[in-house]
Amino acid sequence: MSDKLKQFKLLIVLSLFLLAIPLYFTYNHFQQSSVLKEAFEKNERIEVLHHLMASGKYASDIRKAGYVVPPDGAIRLDGGIDSIEIKGDIDLKISNPGRNEVTVLFETTAKEEKIDVYYILDNQLTIKRSYYSNISNQKIKESVDISQAEEERLLKIVQKELEDFMEKMYQTLYG
């Protein structure tokens, strides 16, 4: 009788252990999803981008929303999404965000010159740092200055594109 009781106890312990594993993963998945939704609702843009780009988990959702991300193999190799491309009034490339900032790259034209623009934005999508450059006739990358009015115009376009991205991703994920 004692042997059967030990086997029964062992079977119960093993069953509880096997039940705990999927419950843990289900809880963990729900927790991550709720953290992302909370970041969306609090308008924490950097945190939202970080969660979306931290792994390949949301790559198909980002593609479904109409944005461009690297192929799944590259995402697995990099351990996450290194950039998201937004096609709009200007074609933006968002790099994986840092702690309190996100890098946005795009091209524009000013004075009939193609200019590469590099913005580092904070959570309110204001410019922390900016850099403008072009390739000269001698194939040398040179720094370019643009007017304050032009910078403000470009920033408004970038802010609109990023806000539209956030709204569309929220609708795609929780819609």
Give the ranges of each region predicted by the language model.
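Intrinsic structural disorder/low-complexity segments
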Residues: 10, 32-35, 121
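Extracytoplasmic electrostatic interaction patches
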Residues: 74, 78-175
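Short, flexible coil/linker elements and helix-boundary hinge sites characteristic
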Residues: 8, 34, 43, 56-57, ...
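Hydrophobic membrane-insertion alpha-helices, especially the h-region
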Residues: 9-28
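N-terminal export/targeting and maturation segments
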Residues: 22-105
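Short, Lys/Arg-rich N-terminal segment immediately upstream of the first membrane anchor
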Residues: 1-7
